[in-house]
């Protein structure tokens, strides 16, 4: 009863306000223009490096992505990716000792549980767009287990250089809010944590290192 009475009193109060509102105004049109850059790609590279990421270049038709990943992380032995371009045989072929080291490739789409990805050295994913103002990359959940984005020691993000926008306003206008994506995240360089003593620690909560491969 008390809840009902409170609700009625609230409605009565709001109705009185509506009755006594003599002048109404349309909602203002708010146009926010974010920062613009002469060269968005150059700014993205500079910002990515400033937040601790490494940036590498590759051509679109380059079949060397496995070699590029191995060049970036030659000591890695356990990889995770659901990208068809990432292949165990090619990762094995580009091991520093000529292919005698055992290399493991886990697929986040086929593991039974997310904790099976624990111990992953390098995760390779594809980003949807990059943002020049802060060096972040939007990564939608195109994999079953999104834990691969956070549980791996290092993260490699493949990004089309033509998909870099100026600012976050442009980014939110372009990201695909598709129901098939249950999750998405902006990642800007490696994980960073700072305490009250202003000590910056990288990799405490996610990847210790991030490499963005522009193609």
What are these regions (language model features)?
Residues 2-215:
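The feature marks the mature, well-folded catalytic cores of soluble enzymes
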